[in-house]
C-alpha cells in the first residue's frame, strides 16, 4: 500500500475511533449498584435479601463520631451538625440524643395524638391535664426550660417528646450536654440516608454533604469526624479499589511499553499495535451502551482486564514477521490459528452470558465484541500500516539459545499422568472448605475499621446488619396490625435479655384501627376547653396560652387516619417506607434487631406465628445465593468447555492435535486450583473469572506451540511472541497479585499462576520434532 493510502487508512481508523468515543461519551451511563453482579434470586429469602441488601433500613445507616475537643465543644458541634443535616433531603433521619421538635413534619403534628400511646391508658380529662400542667411548671424551673418554652403552648402533655423518645434507639448512649457520648468521650450521631447502602455514588454524595456541613461549623478545625456503616464501607471499598487499580495500571502500562520497545525496537510499531486494542475497548463499550440502559463500573474494570487476551493478536503479528516479508503475508499465514484462538476465547466468555446475571452478561458482550474487533482489525487493517522494513526476531542470539534449550527439554509421555496425580494429591490434602461462600471474607476493610464500626454500633444501639424480623400479611394494614400484636412478645424477649431491641413498623405508625380508637377518645372542643380551664385553676399560666393545643386536638378529631403513603412525605415516614415492602400480592414488614443474644428465641417466635413472622439470616441467604451463582457459572463453563473441545477439534482436524492443545490447558487450570487450595485459599467467584481469563491465554500458548512448521526460525518466532505475551501478562497480573484488595489479589494470583503453568505445560506437552538448521 502506497504512503498516501496508508495515511488515508490511518486517518479513517482514527476518525472511526473518535466517532465511537463520541457515541460512548453521549450514551454511557455508569451504574454502581452491586446487585447487578448478583444472580436472580430463587427463594423468598434470597429475593428479600436482594431487595433489602442496599435498600433496607439497616444498610442506610451512617454512624458518626466526633472527637478531639472538650465535651462542651463536642456537644455544640453535634448540635450544629444535626441542625445542618436535618433540612437536607439526602437524609431521612438525624439523631444525636437531643430532643427533636421537628421529628414530625409540621403538617403532621396534630397526628401526634393518634401516634402516641397516651390515650390507650389515659383520657385527656381535667385530672390528667392538671397533673401535666403542674409537671410543666416544675420543668420550667429546670435546665430544660429553654427547650419547653416553644413547645408548651401547643403540646403541654409533651406527646412529641414521648414520640421522640420512642423513636430514639432503645439502647441509647450516655447523654452529656443534651447529646449522645461514647465512653471514649466522642459525640455520637446516627444518620439515615435516602440513598441505598449499595449505591456508592449516592452514598459518596451523602458523605460529602456530612463532611462539608461539619467543616463549615465554627470550632470544627481541631475536631475529628469519623464515619462508619454499610454505605461508608461501600465508598471506602470503591475508593481503595480504584486507587490500587490506578497505580497498578500506571506501573504495568509503563512496564508493558518498555517490554514492547525492548522486544521490537520500533516506536511506530508500538503505537500502531495499540490501535486494535483501543478499537476493541471503544467498540465493546459502544455496543454495551446500545444494548443496556446502564453499564456497571465493575463491567468496565473487569472487561479491560479480560481484553488483555486481545493484546496478543498484534504481538503475534509483530513477532512472526520475516525480514523483507510484507505484513500481509505474515498475517495471512497466522490467520487460521489466530481465528481459532479468537473463536475459542469468545466461546469461553459466552459462559458469562449464559450465567444469566446482568453484570456478567454485560461483561460477556463487552469482551466478545472487543475480541472480535481486535482480531479482525489486526487481520485486515493493522498489516497495511506497519513499517515495511522490520528486524527478524528469529536472528536474535539469545532467542536462538533459548529455543535450543527448549528443544533439549525432556518430554516424557508420563508428564500428564504425573501432573494429574499431583493435582489429585494437593486437592486431597488441601485444608479448609473448597468454596468461599462468605462475601464478608472478601472485604478489603482493615480490622481496625471493622472494630470501630462494631464499637459505635454497640454504643449507639444501631441495628444488626445480619438479621431481620420479617412480618407477612395480605395488606399493608395487616402488617401494621401484626406488628402491634407482636410487641408484647418482643417486650418479653427484651426482658429475658434475648435481644436488646427490635424496631417494628408499628413503632412509627400504628394501624388505622388503633388510630381511630385513639381518635374517638379525643374530647370535643368544648369539653377540652372546660377541662383545661379547670386544670389551670391556681396555676400561673395565662388562660389563652394553650389555644394552639386546643386547636390541634380539634384538628386531630377530624383527621383521616395517617397512612404510610401520606407519612412517607415526611423524612421520618421514609424510614417507615423502608420497613414496608409489597411483593407478589402480599406485604412484608421488616423489623430491625439490635443486640441479638439468643437467635433460637427469635426463631421460636417465628415458629409460633404460623409462618407470618420469621427471622431472616441475611448471611445465610447471601451464602445460598453465592452457591447458586457458582453452580450456574460452573454449568455454563461445562457447556462452554464442550463447545471449546468441538471447536478446537474441528479447526485442527485431528484428535491428536486437539489433545496437544486442550490437555495442557485443562491440566494447568486444575493445577492452579490445586496449588491455591493447598495454600489454604478458598475458591471464590472471582477465582473462577480469573481461571477463565488464564485459560484463554493458555489456549493461545498451546495453539501456537502445537503449530510445528518444520522451520526452526519460525519456531523461534513463536517462542519470541509467546515469551512477550507471557511477560506482559505476568507484569500486569503479577502486580495485581500484590494488591491488598482481596478481589484484585484473587484475580492477579490466579492469572499469574495460570500463565506460568500454561506456558510450561504447553511447551512440555507440545508435539516435538527437532529440526536442525542448515
Predicted regions, residues:
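Signature of alpha-helical transmembrane segments and their immediate interfacial
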Residues: 1-32, 383-384, 388-438
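Alpha-helical transmembrane helix bundles of large polytopic membrane transport and channel proteins
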Residues: 22-23, 76-187, 497-575
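Solvent-exposed, non-transmembrane loop/terminal regulatory segments of multi-pass membrane proteins
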Residues: 23-69, 168-176, 411-414, 432-474, ...
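Extracytoplasmic
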Residues: 146-262, 266, 554-644
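Hydrophobic transmembrane alpha-helices and their membrane-interface caps
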Residues: 270-316, 657-702, 734
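Pore- and gate-forming transmembrane helices of large, multi-pass membrane proteins
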Residues: 274, 324-355, 711-740
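Transmembrane alpha-helices and their membrane-interface boundaries in multi-pass membrane transporters
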Residues: 290, 306-322, 335, 339-343, ...
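Juxtamembrane segments of multi-pass membrane proteins
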Residues: 414-538
